[in-house]
């Protein structure tokens, strides 16, 4: 016979994705393809897409964690753009990173300037007791 076929020899191992090798959910192969296709550099190393996919996965997980907390605070089970906006703008580092980003349907942070808030007057606190040493007949000239 001519030696065709693979009756003997080692069986090929099951293919394992680079994402699973790195322990990531984000696609390392797709990130690598996009880095090559984007012409960011003439060549792309093997570790670069793994690192970039890990960074993207971490940032996504961080934002989704905070947005999930915002949704739970509002007694909702579904994350909407408003929850993403609240999560990002209330976190100092994420707000700095995504400062120039506009989130559609995100709204604004609730904020009322202190000067616009109603002043707490002494009348709302309660009637003042007369000071010790003054007689009740000597009323002050306060208006």
UniProtKB/Swiss-Prot annotation:
Chain segments annotated as transmembrane: none
Cross-link Glycyl lysine isopeptide (Lys-Gly) (interchain with G-Cter in ubiquitin): residue positions: 14, 16, 120
Keywords assigned by UniProt, alphabetized: Acetylation, Cell cycle, Chromosome, DNA damage, DNA recombination, DNA repair, DNA-binding, Isopeptide bond, Meiosis, Nucleosome core, Nucleus, Phosphoprotein, Ubl conjugation
Molecular-function annotations in GO: chromatin-protein adaptor activity; damaged DNA binding; enzyme binding; histone binding; protein heterodimerization activity; structural constituent of chromatin
Motif, [ST]-Q motif: chain positions: 140-141
Residue numbers carrying N-acetylserine: 2
Annotated crosslink Glycyl lysine isopeptide (Lys-Gly) (interchain with G-Cter in SUMO2) location: 128, 135
GO CC, any one term: centrosome
Effect of residue 137 to A: Increased genomic instability and radiosensitivity
Tissue specificity comment: Most abundant in testis, thymus and spleen.
PTM (free text): Phosphorylated on Ser-140 (to form gamma-H2AX or H2AX139ph) in response to DNA double strand breaks (DSBs) generated by exogenous genotoxic agents, by stalled replication forks, by meiotic recombination events and during immunoglobulin class switching in lymphocytes. Phosphorylation can extend up to several thousand nucleosomes from the actual site of the DSB and may mark the surrounding chromatin for recruitment of proteins required for DNA damage signaling and repair. Widespread phosphorylation may also serve to amplify the damage signal or aid repair of persistent lesions.
Region (Disordered): 1-22, 121-143
In-chain residues carrying the UniProt-annotated modification N6-acetyllysine: 6, 10, 37
Consequence when changing residue 10 to A: No effect on radiosensitivity
InterPro entries referenced in this protein's UniProt entry, alphabetically: Histone-fold (IPR009072), Histone_H2A (IPR002119), Histone_H2A/H2B/H3 (IPR007125), Histone_H2A_C (IPR032454), Histone_H2A_CS (IPR032458)
Outcome (variant: residue 16 to A): No effect on radiosensitivity
Quaternary structure, from the entry: The nucleosome is a histone octamer containing two molecules each of H2A, H2B, H3 and H4 assembled in one H3-H4 heterotetramer and two H2A-H2B heterodimers. The octamer wraps approximately 147 bp of DNA. Interacts with numerous proteins required for DNA damage signaling and repair when phosphorylated on Ser-140. These include MDC1, BRCA1 and the MRN complex, composed of MRE11, RAD50, and NBN. Interaction with the MRN complex is mediated at least in part by NBN. Also interacts with DHX9/NDHII when phosphorylated on Ser-140 and MCPH1 when phosphorylated at Ser-140 or Tyr-143.
Miscellaneous information on this protein: Haploinsufficient for the suppression of genomic instability. This phenotype is further exacerbated in the absence of TP53.
Role description: Variant histone H2A which replaces conventional H2A in a subset of nucleosomes. Nucleosomes wrap and compact DNA into chromatin, limiting DNA accessibility to the cellular machineries which require DNA as a template. Histones thereby play a central role in transcription regulation, DNA repair, DNA replication and chromosomal stability. DNA accessibility is regulated via a complex set of post-translational modifications of histones, also called histone code, and nucleosome remodeling.
Family named by the database record: Belongs to the histone H2A family.
Protein name (record): Histone H2AX
Organism: Mus musculus
């Amino acid at each position: 016979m001519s030696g065709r076929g693979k009756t003997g020899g080692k069986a090929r191992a099951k293919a394992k994705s680079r994402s699973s090798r790195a322990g990531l959910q984000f696609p390392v192969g797709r990130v690598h393809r996009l880095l090559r296709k984007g012409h960011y550099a003439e060549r792309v190393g093997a570790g670069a897409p793994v690192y970039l996919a890990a960074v993207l996965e971490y940032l996504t997980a961080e934002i989704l964690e905070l947005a999930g907390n915002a949704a739970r605070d509002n007694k909702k089970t579904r994350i909407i753009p408003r929850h993403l906006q609240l999560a990002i703008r209330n976190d100092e580092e994420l707000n700095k990173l995504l400062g120039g980003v506009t989130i559609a349907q995100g709204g604004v942070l609730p904020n009322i300037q202190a000067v616009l808030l109603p002043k707490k007057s002494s009348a709302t606190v309660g009637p003042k007791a007369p000071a010790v040493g003054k007689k009740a007949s000597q009323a002050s000239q306060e208006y």
